[in-house]
């Protein structure tokens, strides 16, 4: 068969015109090494800091170190199936997690995937986990309270909506108990809660979830769990994922409360990731940016003004402020609050609740040291009735602690000193509270009123808590109108004060105290 040149050229042209040359441009690289969840990848010349990378087997990673000819990335999840020579692709996306009310009542991992066996979560929206905190102009001052239901906190270390209040103490001092009680007390108050568990035993997390379910608190709570068995990368990112879920409510004019339990373990996880990425270590082998690790997280907790909410929702929500209140937890070693991470977080937050082992072992629970626990902005948010009644309590306690130290050495004490010591003992006893039994505002007001006006002075110390319970029951059965007025107005008028005095006197006469 003879082909002339013109036929050959026509054949070639027709083949070229029919050729599908649509190429997909992908930035790819090759795995050089994989150790302890850290992958070194050659190539990926166009990768961004913090970009999600796609590994074989539908596994994702995060680009953290951008070097001249390689990229250091952490793998999110299992990494055993990744081997040298595997192809890695850029996704062009930043790490996102699902957000919205569909998450309420669920337990999820750092990536927002359900781990409670209750089926998939059909969240309609996702959001990035790393965000810039609201600016100064978008914020509003803290002026509404977050009632924890714990007498010693609501009276002496009040927390406001949009505040960051640190809970700090050694292991086994009741830090998680305080945080869980605060979540349980938000029932019916329109506050959505997020509990972030970092580096804890899976059994401990399951126990907290069970308690929240028992008290009906899971209806308005999301639990983000990064257990001790999860990779360091998942533990380090969990608080940011939880914060994004909380911000969903804040930015839409709702109130949210987030507990980070605890940030010490997050700092340990970040230190591990940084050292494996061969970043230079600093004090206590932490990387240089460990302060920024916590500051950029905690600055996202804020009270935002109505303009911000209106702009964010494109006018759908008008005239409502939103807030995200943070309760970060820090575990100290042998009471050393001057270590690197505790001092960092103390300087970032708006106050701290300091829990002491000695008080805990002495049976004073919650074991709050009233002397060094402070709330720098919560005073403006405290309910009027509690604010007016709690001033005397703090003074009584401070004087009692001071005198108790001297009283150990002095054999004979004058009447005034003895009186102060007796009152201090009773106030200390009054501030004890069993776990999972948060109090309402009227109950706290009644207890503080009884202490301030000397009604407890002739009650035996061992009878203080039974006296308090009896008083609350007495008020509930016979003085319902008074209770409702205190709950509604959050104030104690002259008439109500006289009625409350009469009620307490009436109870003391009828009861055998």
Swiss-Prot record:
Keyword Translocase, does the record have it?
Answer: yes
Q: Which InterPro entries match?
A: ATP_synth_asu-like_sf (IPR023366), ATP_synth_asu_C (IPR000793), ATP_synth_asu_C_sf (IPR038376), ATP_synth_F1_a_nt-bd_dom (IPR033732), ATP_synth_F1_asu (IPR005294), ATPase_a/bsu_AS (IPR020003), ATPase_F1/V1/A1_a/bsu_N (IPR004100), ATPase_F1/V1/A1_a/bsu_N_sf (IPR036121)
**Nucleotide-binding recorded as keyword:** yes
Top-rank taxon: Bacteria
Site entry (Required for activity), positions: 373
Query: What chemistry does it catalyse, as a reaction equation?
Result: ATP + H2O + 4 H(+)(in) = ADP + phosphate + 5 H(+)(out)
Q: Which UniProt keywords apply?
A: ATP synthesis, ATP-binding, Cell inner membrane, Cell membrane, CF(1), Hydrogen ion transport, Ion transport, Membrane, Nucleotide-binding, Translocase, Transport
| The protein's Enzyme Commission number | 7.1.2.2
Instruction: Provide a Gene Ontology MF annotation, just one.
Output: ADP binding
Q: Where in the cell is it found?
A: Cell inner membrane
Q: Which SUPFAM superfamilies match?
A: C-terminal domain of alpha and beta subunits of F1 ATP synthase, N-terminal domain of alpha and beta subunits of F1 ATP synthase, P-loop containing nucleoside triphosphate hydrolases
Give, as one word, the top-level EC class. Answer: translocase
Q: Which residues bind ATP?
A: 169-176
Topology relative to the membrane, per the entry?
A: Peripheral membrane protein
- What PANTHER family does this protein map onto? ATP SYNTHASE SUBUNIT ALPHA, MITOCHONDRIAL
Concerning its family, UniProt says:
Belongs to the ATPase alpha/beta chains family.
Its job: Produces ATP from ADP in the presence of a proton gradient across the membrane. The alpha chain is a regulatory subunit.
Q: How does it assemble?
A: F-type ATPases have 2 components, CF(1) - the catalytic core - and CF(0) - the membrane proton channel. CF(1) has five subunits: alpha(3), beta(3), gamma(1), delta(1), epsilon(1). CF(0) has three main subunits: a(1), b(2) and c(9-12). The alpha and beta chains form an alternating ring which encloses part of the gamma chain. CF(1) is attached to CF(0) by a central stalk formed by the gamma and epsilon chains, while a peripheral stalk is formed by the delta and b chains.
Protein name stated in the entry = ATP synthase subunit alpha
Gene that this sequence comes from: atpA
